[in-house]
Amino acid sequence: MVEDLAASYIVLKLENEIRQAQVQWLMEENAALQAQIPELQKSQAAKEYDLLRKSSEAKEPQKLPEHMNPPAAWEAQKTPEFKEPQKPPEPQDLLPWEPPAAWELQEAPAAPESLAPPATRESQKPPMAHEIPTVLEGQGPANTQDATIAQEPKNSEPQDPPNIEKPQEAPEYQETAAQLEFLELPPPQEPLEPSNAQEFLELSAAQESLEGLIVVETSAASEFPQAPIGLEATDFPLQYTLTFSGDSQKLPEFLVQLYSYMRVRGHLYPTEAALVSFVGNCFSGRAGWWFQLLLDIQSPLLEQCESFIPVLQDTFDNPENMKDANQCIHQLCQGEGHVATHFHLIAQELNWDESTLWIQFQEGLASSIQDELSHTSPATNLSDLITQCISLEEKPDPNPLGKSSSAEGDGPESPPAENQPMQAAINCPHISEAEWVRWHKGRLCLYCGYPGHFARDCPVKPHQALQAGNIQACQ
């Protein structure tokens, strides 16, 4: 059940990380595009300014003839003043037209001098003056009415310039308005040349790909143990604190977090011993004390994480109440085996202070161990006292064969209570038969529960006698 919850938790967490990476990538892409907008606006504004300048330069030579048309119109208006005495239809009067035409040629340059026009106007007016005689010469044999008809379109020329200038002025206002609109409201779709657009897309795509790779490397390499090669980088910080103080109510939550961490970052710990050491560093309080005891006795559980986790779960997630633990710790006594582990397992369920546990631990020690402790330097805390006891218990026995032969002789019978180091643990419900199975998996002695030998080589009692003692204790 816990593994299923851990698996579902990991799946949800991975999906969340992927969504967060996608959102971050989109935000960076949006930021990159927004950073490119001012440059595009500047380039577009420069292009618009160049187009407006070119269009204004192209329109300037067209405006010059407009200003030059009024003098030409004035000349066309002056001709009828000289032609008024020519109204009689006498054919002889047609000959004197030549002097007025020549006189007009002289007056044409005089009029621009009084008005002081630029040189461009002077260069353009002589053709106007020459055109008038040519028209008049072609109309010489014709009637004066034809001349007046030919002059009427010329008289209408002064009316054309204002009409022509009005539509030319309107685009100027429209262009200025267009400039203001361009500056105030930048268009979302700016026209770009195909080559510029391709370069911009290539540059933006390259930048976004590099930034995306950096983000993915920092997150995926730390969160996914089987990430592709090249994406492994610095570890991503945990979103929760992986700690356990020994509270049985918080153990399931700690195990879920631990399983998810092992699935995600298990590759960071090449050996099971390194992983167990990491888990032990997360302990505090009673759990830290229990782990320190395993370090002191060099338990094989420290080398196998698969055996360490079940023992941890059975130790701190046992429904044993404080009353039973209180009874068991008073019944605990030492025979010829270790008592430190059993004392520590029972003390987990009690809220006693260190001084009380110190006194109770000394009461459960064998007299030989107490005598040896009196000749050594006193310990400063309970952990040092337990370490001294373990070192004294592990001293070689001068007559192990005699003990083993006596143990074998007493095999069919139930051993006395003082020769059973696990008698109190067997009587205590905290030590169950499932724990013996875990000791077997942890390569511990199935009789005393400590490393260095197996049950068949145990100097106290063989494995068969231990099973018989368990059956009698249960009965």
UniProtKB/Swiss-Prot annotation:
A zinc finger (CCHC-type) spans 443-462. Residues 51-101, 152-173, 397-421 are annotated as: Disordered. Residues 51-66, 78-87 have a biased composition (Basic and acidic residues). It is found in: Nucleus. GO terms for molecular function: nucleic acid binding; zinc ion binding. Disulfide bonds: none annotated. InterPro entries: DUF4939, RTL1-rel, Znf_CCHC, Znf_CCHC_sf. GO terms for cellular component: nucleus. SMART domains: ZnF_C2HC. The keyword Magnesium does not apply. Keywords: Metal-binding, Nucleus, Zinc, Zinc-finger. May function as a transcriptional regulator. Plays a role in postnatal myogenesis, may be involved in the regulation of satellite cells self-renewal. RTL3 is one of at least 11 genes called Mar or Mart related to long terminal repeat retrotransposons. They do not correspond to functional retrotransposons, but rather to neofunctionalized retrotransposons genes. This is Retrotransposon Gag-like protein 3. It comes from Homo sapiens (Human). The gene is RTL3.
